[in-house]
């Protein structure tokens, strides 16, 4: 019954008849695949736990972790409780073109390490990087040299996010085997330090010098802490949506990253959290495309808001139960009491003929997903649709509930500009001060230090706070440069 196998006359007489689902088949049972992926993630975690316990049996004083690849939709990440802490692997330059500018492919995606930090740090607090790219690699589609300074930039990015350790793969370039063309800290002679190795040396020297400046207590500016934001994440939502996208242009992670990118431009500390965490420690809680939900979770959201939290919920949230089934109720109605809205319907447009959503008399293009809302009297309309048969109908709303607020954004736009503008509008409403850092520049604080990282293709001049003192670099930061200051 949980899988709805009566649909298309599927029936199982016993568990022995159940086979592994063929996920490549377009119409394979969605609910069965969801449960199978839960099972597979659980088995992976059990196996990691078994290995950890076995190692600890014979090496009781040995720390045990594993080297996760940050594929965030894989359900086993963070689920092995026998690990002492979390670690991940991160490569930045391997032939993609996600950097900024003509040579951005030599530096890498500006938020790739930042997002990994913000994802892994909240799991246990203690975490690090087990593999960080030391230079040129062998396994990409095209394997260019990193830009001089990029390896050091990546190391500083790991440190800035709060990591406790950093390792690389590998020390020496291998003389044989599959990865002969993979750089190490030293070259094939085992003696000559590579360009990346020299940047490791520079970083280690800088960290040693910082020990005379750091604060043992994690001092951070008050304005920075006011911006603290959590993104509620459950990989199962991606599993469910990706089986039934309804629009080929839908991308769950791209939807989340539109908001994440804006938050980092605000200079906001961000945590990706699960439902196990306490929502109340965050002034703002973002809930993007959280499709699988139940009444217990919705009640927690309501409680968070009534006690003073600012909740931002986006499209496709709470439309299915935990099995991926549609409730026998009006579509999407589980959160009606939370948002103060009813949903009339949702629409999906061809990318060749996008629609327009308008906020503060400015137009924004969309096509992937749009919910037409019917707001209650207490709701304020933030954005409306244009140029469709539902022109003038609400796309986003805002309401006050108890001591807090609820914002519902029912549309996913094309380039993220709308998402940025609505967050700017909301943080102003919340009286939370934000920065306006250009894409490619990030700011983090740890141990009484401010750390500014420049992944962009041009120099950036950071306004040094009053009373701050530069300890690494200068306020005008070149491409692949770093600036560190004390508070």
Question: Model-found features: residue ranges?
Answer:
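Carbohydrate-binding surfaces of carbohydrate-active enzymes
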Residues: 14-21, 33, 37-40, 49, ...
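Glycine-enriched alpha-helix->loop->beta-strand junction motifs that scaffold or abut catalytic
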Residues: 82-86, 162
């Amino acid at each position: 019954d949980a899988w709805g196998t009566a649909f298309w006359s599927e029936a199982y007489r016993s568990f022995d008849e159940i086979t592994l689902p063929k996920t490549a088949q377009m119409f394979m049972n969605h609910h069965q695949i969801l449960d199978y992926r839960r099972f597979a993630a659980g088995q992976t975690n059990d196996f990691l736990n078994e290995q950890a316990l076995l190692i600890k049996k014979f090496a009781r004083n040995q720390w045990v972790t594993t080297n996760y690849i940050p594929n965030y939709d894989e359900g086993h990440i963070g689920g092995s409780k026998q690990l002492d802490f979390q670690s991940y692997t991160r490569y930045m330059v391997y032939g993609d073109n996600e950097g900024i500018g003509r040579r951005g492919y030599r530096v890498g995606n500006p938020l790739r390490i930042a997002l990994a930090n913000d994802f892994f740090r909240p799991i246990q607090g203690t975490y690090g990087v087990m593999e960080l790219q030391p230079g040129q690699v062998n396994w990409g589609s095209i394997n260019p040299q990193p830009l001089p300074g990029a390896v050091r930039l990546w190391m500083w990015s790991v440190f800035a996010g709060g990591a406790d350790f950093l390792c690389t793969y590998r020390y020496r370039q291998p003389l044989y085997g599959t990865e002969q063309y993979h750089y190490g800290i030293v070259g094939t002679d085992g003696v000559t330090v590579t360009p990346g190795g020299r940047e490791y040396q520079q970083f280690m020297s800088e960290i040693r010098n910082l020990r005379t400046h750091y604060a043992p207590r994690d001092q951070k500016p008050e304005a920075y802490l006011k911006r603290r934001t959590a993104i509620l994440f459950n990989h199962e939502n991606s599993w469910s949506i990706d089986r039934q996208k309804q629009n080929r242009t839908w991308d769950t992670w791209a939807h989340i990253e539109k908001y994440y990118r804006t938050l980092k431009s605000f200079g906001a500390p961000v945590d990706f959290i699960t439902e196990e965490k306490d929502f109340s420690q965050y002034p703002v809680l973002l809930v993007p495309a959280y499709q699988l939900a139940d009444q217990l979770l919705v009640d927690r959201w309501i409680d968070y808001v009534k006690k003073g939290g600012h909740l931002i919920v986006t499209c496709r949230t709470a439309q299915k139960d935990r099995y991926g089934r549609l409730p026998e109720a009006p579509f999407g109605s589980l959160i009606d009491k939370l948002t103060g809205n009813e949903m009339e319907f949702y629409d999906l447009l061809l990318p060749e003929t996008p629609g327009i959503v308008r906020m503060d008399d400015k137009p924004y293009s969309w096509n992937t997903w749009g919910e037409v809302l019917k707001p209650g009297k207490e709701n304020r309309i933030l954005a409306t649709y244009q140029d469709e048969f539902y022109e003038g109908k609400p796309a986003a709303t805002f309401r006050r509930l108890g001591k807090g607020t609820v914002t519902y954004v029912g549309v996913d736009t094309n380039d993220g500009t709308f998402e940025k503008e609505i967050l700017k509008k909301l943080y102003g409403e919340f009286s939370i001060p934000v920065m306006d850092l250009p894409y490619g520049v990030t700011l983090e604080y740890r141990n009484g230090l401010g750390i500014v990282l420049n992944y962009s293709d041009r120099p950036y001049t950071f306004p040094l706070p009053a009373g701050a003192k530069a300890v690494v670099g200068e306020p005008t930061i070149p491409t692949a440069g770093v600036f560190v200051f004390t508070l």
